[in-house]
Amino acid sequence: MTNRIIKKVLSALSHQALVRVMSALFFSLALMTNFAHSVEYPSGVVRIIVGFPPGNATDIVARVFAKQMSEAFNGAPFVVENMVGAAGSIGTAAVAKATPNGLTLLVGSVGTLAMNPWLIKNLPYDPAKDFVPLAQLASVPMYVTVQSTLPVNSFTDLVALAKQKPGVLNFGSSGNGSANHLIAAVVASTSSIDITHIPYKGSAPAVTDLLAGRLSLMVETAPAVLPHVKSGKLKILAVTKPTRTAILPDVLTLSESGYPGFDAQAWIGFAAPAGTPREILDVLGRTAAQVVGSKLFAAKMVELGLEPMASTSPAQFSSYLNGEIKRWGTVTERIGIVRE
């Protein structure tokens, strides 16, 4: 009797309707499978490795992100660990070599994931092969900043002064090959000015010397310089991203300052070691997208002087990262930087 009823029902269904029913069934099973995996993950403490010291922009973003990921996983522990050294490559390499079980993850930067391959000989990891990009967390606008006594009030003024005194002006950075070194070098190359690079061990001592007048300028993040701009000790002349920023909407872009299309900014991203099981990657990618897309995370990024991402996905970040690796290879070749 039951079999006859089933046959009648099936015969009454059109082929397309049957396909829709079966598709819905498989979709439901897929959701149940994903839900099961999300319940199982994480199986222990999740370590998020940062290759920079506490207080660095990458570290600060990692801590905000880790806290919100922990909340998204019902209080599961997401702990930030700083493994400092070699322009962030020590910590990054540690993640590349870690067991790919989703318990050791990376919050890296444009420096560690896109610039270091062109700066460091025998780099102990390949960012294009050793990681699975999961989410871009924030972009980090960089600002051309000068000491307040320097007689310039715009980027155009700065270029004119530098051309009047070739080699006399100098700029500081947080170290050879750092993001603010390379971006400043691109600024100088694009505007055809001759300024001398002075590397420091971190941004803090460089900003100290900028305040003291021992440096002419820096290309730095808002968190590092904005307090001193507000106090009148520093001046911001331009931002290196293609659009103005929410935190400093009156600051001109370099595109608006005579260099159309100029775009050289830092960013921070989230990745897992290659070989991590697909179901874990899916859970991490989906949850990271929810965190990064939340109003809470976006508000915190703006508060820090960073630019939140409107949307992000593993595929988007992977495509962006591959483009950035190629772009910075071209840039380092153009400005004459060789691997050391």
Description of each model-found segment:
Residues D126-Q136, G172, D194-I198, S216-L217, ...:
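Short beta-strand->loop
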Residues H37-K129, V168, N176, S192-T221, ...:
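N-terminal (or domain-start) structured segment
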Residues S43-V45, K230, R278-E340:
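An extracytoplasmic/periplasmic, membrane-proximal ligand-sensing/linker region
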Residues V19-N34:
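Bacterial N-terminal signal peptides
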Residues M1-A17:
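N-terminal secretory signal peptides that target proteins for export/translocation
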Residues K97-T104, V110, W118-P205, L254, ...:
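Hinge/capping helix and adjacent helix->loop/strand transition within the periplasmic-binding protein
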Residues V9, H37-E40, Q68-A72, K121, ...:
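Short hydrophobic alpha-helices and adjacent helix-cap/hinge residues
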